[in-house]
Amino acid sequence: VTSHRERNDRKAPFRGAHPGGPRGGNFRGAKTASSDPSGWIWGWHAVEAALTNPDRAAPAKVLATAERAERLKALHPRLPLEILENGEIARRLPPGAAHQGVAVQTPALDGVALEALADPAEGFLLMLDQVTDPQNVGAIFRSAAAFGARGVILQDRHAPQLGGALAKAAAGAIESVPAARVVNLARALDKLADLGWTIVGLAGESDTPLETALDGRPAVLVMGSEGEGLRRLIGEHCDILAHIPMPGGFESLNVAAAAAIALYEASRRVGARVTGERG
């Protein structure tokens, strides 16, 4: 097994935290979206995925308009429903929640242990370093599902809960893409390296294109926050730093868009998880 010190010796020093720069561009973040600590999930695709996920506990409440209730009863005949007008549903939810006539209150998913997600080392994973905007994280889960990522690794304290606006933006993807929460990302990266993963950090100042950094071995893509990019310590724990080439000259990407490109490239270079497989 290669040590962290030996791995660091093989790459150039980490020159900065921000994913911006002359090649990689600036990963722009959106304004913080609504989040909800009380366990509400809203929006048709997010609710339907939650109701069909066998890993979830039975919902405490299901709110629906009369039209949505008919559709839900056809799919889930025994589901207890509270039929309300659109405005009444909206008053139960955080301001601005686009509920599409349906919402469910359910305990948060427990997630999986890092070792269960990463052992054996196969395919590719995505780690988010303090990406906090629920809309962005939800969109990233959606891309992770589309391109067959094995799972997503989040920091325990500096990441949104997998519900509310995040679940709506993910359109059900949080139910199919396994997620692991860890206290310390740097220690998690050391563990992943010991398991045989190559750690690829996205950083605009890197001279290495992402397609070159992904050499077919199992890989962890590490994305930095919307405003600050990779933190220095996290960058120093990567085997290699890579940038996304932007030949058009417009060097500014939302972090969710950058993650989608990186995940697509990983699916080509490393290989995707089989559709429908969890963990």
Model-derived features: positions:
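Short, ordered loop/turn segments at secondary-structure junctions
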Residues: A66-A69, N86-I89, R157-A159, N184, ...
